[in-house]
Amino acid sequence: MVSFSKNKILSAAVFASVLLLDNNNSEFNNNLFSKNAKGLNSNKRLLHESQAHAGDAHHAHHVADAHHAHHAANAHHAANAHHAANAHHAANAHHAANAHHAANAHHAANAHHAANAHHAANAHHAANAHHAANAHHAANAHHAADANHGFHFNLHDNNSHTLHHAKANACFDDSHHDDAHHDGAHHDDAHHDGAHHDGAHHDGAHHDGAHHNATTHHLHH
């Protein structure tokens, strides 16, 4: 008859308990590691998604009160407006605030720090406008403020449209934008002909009478 001493039985019981405890700890550690790994993956995924949403839109958190911001990408033949604020059709606006159709707007290109610009980037056929504010047809405007055809205005003009932008006079005087700069060759019929600015391109819905009435929109042309 086989007999076991109390010490052997106790030792076996302790050994079994240690094995059970070790298995439980291993399972616990595995579960904990799995949960941590899932949490880490979740954090990585969140970071990746955040970065993905941050891509293309550079400093999108600076874009305030964007009107129709969903229209802000690849708008109409426009490119590279930097820091364009309150821009109406301002192009590829970087830090664009209160932008109406603010990205890749209307033939706008290379506008840097353009504020309150209507077609401010290369403001409606304006080339290399730097800090051009409210510049419409402003060409090579450097720090031009509220210039809407401003280089043709004078403070004594009683036309309401020009008086509205009269403060541009100091910035765009005749000596700065003389006839040689905006002569017939620069703004001739071929440049602003019917095919380029036809009814479909600038119809009533896009540029209504109140905004660009017929008598004041291309007065200098």
From Swiss-Prot:
Q: Name one Pfam family in it.
A: Plasmodium_HRP
Query: Is Glycoprotein among this UniProt entry's keywords?
Result: no
Q: Which residues are the signal sequence here? A: 1-21
Give me the ranges of the annotated region 7 X 5 AA tandem repeats of H-H-D-[DG]-A.
Answer: 176-210
Q: Where is this region: Disordered?
A: 52-141, 180-221
Where in the sequence does UniProt note compositional bias of the Low complexity kind?
Answer: 75-141
Give the span(s) annotated as 13 X 6 AA approximate tandem repeats of A-H-H-A-A-N.
Answer: 69-146
Q: Coiled-coil ranges per the record?
A: none
Renumbered to this chain, the Basic and acidic residues biased-composition regions fall at 52-67, 180-211
Segments for region (4 X 3 AA approximate tandem repeats of A-H-H): 57-68
Give the superkingdom in one word.
Answer: Eukaryota
Alphabetically ordered keywords of this record: Malaria, Repeat, Signal
Tell me the disulfide pairings in this chain. none
Q: Where are the sequence repeats?
A: 57-59, 60-62, 63-65, 66-68, 69-74, 75-80, 81-86, 87-92, 93-98, 99-104, 105-110, 111-116, 117-122, 123-128, 129-134, 135-140, 141-146, 176-180, 181-185, 186-190, 191-195, 196-200, 201-205, 206-210
Q: What is this protein called?
A: Small histidine-alanine-rich protein
Organism expressing this protein natively: Plasmodium falciparum (isolate FC27 / Papua New Guinea)
